[in-house]
A protein has these predicted regions:
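Amphipathic heptad-repeat coiled-coil alpha-helices used as elongated oligomerization/stalk/scaffold segments
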Residues: 1-25, 29-36, 40, 44, ...
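Elongated, mostly alpha-helical coiled-coil "stalk/stator" tethers of large membrane protein machines
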Residues: 29-180
Length: 180
């Protein structure tokens, strides 16, 4: 009878430890999920900011000038092709004289020959923030891709890619902000 009582008592203690461990793990999972939800909310806010940035004509124009010059410098090839969204074609065309001057000023040499690749535009922007976060279709919030004339070398300077790179590079720090 004593052995039976001890066996039941040990089984009861094991069951309590298992229950405690199960509750502890469930709480850990809830905390991790809440932290991941908060990080994803930050990403969605940043994506929404990209949408509004491309609507601010003056600021977006300055940004596009910088992105094109930077892409041309990184590529280091001549001639080069610039790909942009269809809605950005007039802007990029109007920036071409400024691009050459900015490149010359920044790098102290003549700008490479570039032309706009209108045959292969980047995807259009998302219509709203919900579409942007849904992932149902490919979109581009702005920026350019500068490629070599044969397309073998590509410098992606789109806002979405820059956000993705910044997000991935800072993900540990972002998650750390929500540690308890």
């Amino acid at each position: 009878m004593r052995r039976d009582f001890d066996r039941r008592q040990k089984a009861n203690a094991v069951r309590k430890k298992v229950e405690y461990s199960k509750r502890l793990n469930e709480n850990r999972i809830r905390v991790l999920q809440a932290r991941e939800d908060a990080v994803q909310a930050l990403l969605r806010d940043a994506q929404a900011s990209l949408l509004s940035l491309s609507l601010n004509t003056a600021e977006y124009s300055r940004l596009m000038l910088s992105l094109i010059v930077e892409g041309m410098h990184k590529l280091g090839e001549s001639p080069a092709l610039i790909r942009c969204r269809e809605i950005d074609v007039p802007l990029v065309e109007s920036l071409m004289p400024q691009v050459e001057a900015a490149y010359r000023a920044a790098h102290g040499r003549e700008a490479p020959n570039v032309r706009l690749d209108t045959a292969n535009p980047l995807p259009p922007p998302p219509r709203n923030a919900e579409e942007q976060s849904s992932g149902e279709r490919v979109f581009c919030s702005g920026g350019v891709i500068v490629t070599s004339s044969d397309g073998s070398i590509e410098c992606t300077n789109t806002l979405d890619d820059r956000l993705r790179i910044a997000y991935m590079g800072n993900l540990p720090a972002l998650r750390g902000m929500f540690d308890t």
